[in-house]
Amino acid sequence: MDKEFLISALKSIENAKRENRDRVANIVYNHKELFNYLVELTFLVDDKISIKAAWILEWMCTHGNLPWILPHLDEFTKNISSLHFDSAIRPCAKICEQIAKVYTSKKENEFQSTLTHEQIDAIVETGFDWLITPQKIAVRAYTMHTLYLFGLQKDWVPPELEHLITTKISKESKGCKARGTHILSLIKKHQKI
């Protein structure tokens, strides 16, 4: 199994239906050597194959295989800011949220000893960029939660996030407003502790 095989499998995905994503994700799951190529293809940002690669990368990271991304954290965090297809940004925003959840977990894990300050900064910086530029609701929702979680350790993040939510996001769709209100309540709750 090589990169060309993975490209062929990705091209065979007709749409984002679960069964299509499951089929290709299972191929990668059963041939872990393809994961390197999956990360690489996710960041071919001018090629639409990156969208399908991002879908599968998200599936892998949200179905118990998040640690597989550990050796690729540099590549992932350095390149997420270059994504420009909406359908590739959303899955990567969700992966960022998953990374933030695991990193800030009370349960000791590999991410806490592997994820660097530079990598966190790259995720945070990209997250703020995603919040100030036009993005889909899901990207905003995942990103607000990611920034809240990393803001538990970076003092400057909560006030910036709070400002963005109150001045911009709260004036957007009902979904953004609801998630923004939830994140604001988490920030306030944490400030009282």
Residue ranges of model-derived segments:
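Alpha-helical scaffold domains
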Residues: 1-193
